[in-house]
A protein has these predicted regions:
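Conserved catalytic palm subdomain of right-hand nucleotidyl-transferase polymerases, strongest
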Residues: 1-2
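Short linear motifs embedded in intrinsically disordered, charge-biased segments
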Residues: 6-11, 16, 22-45, 49-339
């Protein structure tokens, strides 16, 4: 806190809060003996999350910089992605990443924290380097994909692995609620509300950033249709068309719902200040040259086509998004249960 220019009075007050602190654990209705807490922040204290984030910021400020990140804007680089203690370091070269990792471990130790080697992974993209990244004498595991904040990130990019993971998790949740779907005491409308809040929310987590191909759309819609038929107790040889199924359950096509979520996120992002990280990411043009041949369809190119279908450009969408009501009407028109 001294490094951040906080007054001595405030620092001393916080120190006094932590002096001789301890705790007890309630186990089977009984309290354990009092024990001292000599590391970490106080559990349940309102100021604890702030102090922890301050420590993480202190560590990263001293572990990054020096042109070891990836080019982000004309005059700045992106060194890391952080959410609490879930950190993702970014570098162009193996040497830069090793230096950054060494600094992270060193600075973490200075505030009593330690990098979990077992949970730390390395992912390389578009490189021929085979030299490993190490922490001390331990070589970090290299992976082709990893999960960050619930979304699957792969070496080659794309959405396939993330969609596959979301379907798996949603299917598991749907199976755990089998007593709800088979119950004769719960109305269908109530079951559909439970499905939307407990299953569909898991399935569509992070879908705002998906690049949706026809194949992925088919996989998602097939899963949804199976769930809806189970909720309505429609089994073979009984038959119902997909259109009738959607109308009866008042469910939109999955592609339309994902587009609606994407445009809702787009509106929020376009209304942000120009120095917003999310807005930078939306308009970011990565470094490098693309390979010969037909350009690969990306989320950005797909968005451009969707905007063109609405007779909008990204600049025009940004202007329209400033009017929340107008943008809300646009988003509402993208999703129809009977389309």
């Amino acid at each position: 806190m001294e490094d951040y220019g906080q007054p001595d009075k405030l620092i001393n007050l916080i120190k006094s809060m932590y002096k001789d602190s301890g705790g007890q654990i309630l186990h089977k209705g009984k309290l354990t003996d009092f024990f001292a807490i000599v590391t970490g922040v106080r559990q349940g204290c309102l100021i604890s999350p702030f102090l922890f984030l301050l420590a993480i910021d202190w560590i990263l400020t001293r572990s990054t910089g020096d042109n070891t990140g990836i080019q982000w804007t004309l005059n700045s680089q992106l060194d890391d992605l952080d959410y609490a203690d879930d950190l993702a370091l970014l570098s162009h070269t193996r040497a830069q990443m090793q230096t950054k990792t060494d600094k992270l471990c060193e600075n973490s130790a200075m505030v009593g924290l330690q990098v979990n080697i077992a949970k730390t992974k390395v992912m390389k993209s578009n490189t021929t380097s085979t030299e490993p990244i190490q922490i001390g004498n331990t070589q970090l595991e290299e992976v082709g994909k990893f999960v960050y904040l619930g979304s699957t990130v792969t070496q080659t990019g794309g959405t396939d692995e993330d969609v596959k993971a979301r379907i798996y998790k949603a299917r598991h949740t749907f199976a755990n609620l089998h007593k709800v779907w088979s119950s004769k005491n719960i109305r269908v409308n109530t079951k559909l509300k439970i499905f939307n809040s407990n299953v569909k929310s898991i399935l569509l987590y992070g879908s705002e950033t998906w690049f949706l191909t026809k194949k992925l759309e088919s996989k998602l819609q097939t899963f949804i249709n199976k769930c809806l038929r189970r909720i309505l107790n429609i089994f073979w040889p009984e038959v119902i068309s997909n259109q009738s199924l959607w109308e009866k359950t008042k469910q939109p096509r999955i592609s339309q719902q994902i587009k609606q979520r994407k445009f809702r996120w787009l509106g929020h992002t376009l209304r942000k200040d120009n120095d917003s990280i999310a807005k930078y990411a939306l308009k970011w043009n990565p470094q490098g040259k693309r390979k010969r041949g037909r350009p690969k369809t990306t989320w950005r190119r797909q968005l451009t086509k969707e905007l063109e279908a609405l007779r909008l450009t990204l600049r025009g969408a940004e202007s329209l998004a400033q009017d929340r009501r107008a943008w809300r009407n646009l988003v509402g028109g993208l999703c129809s249960a009977t389309e």
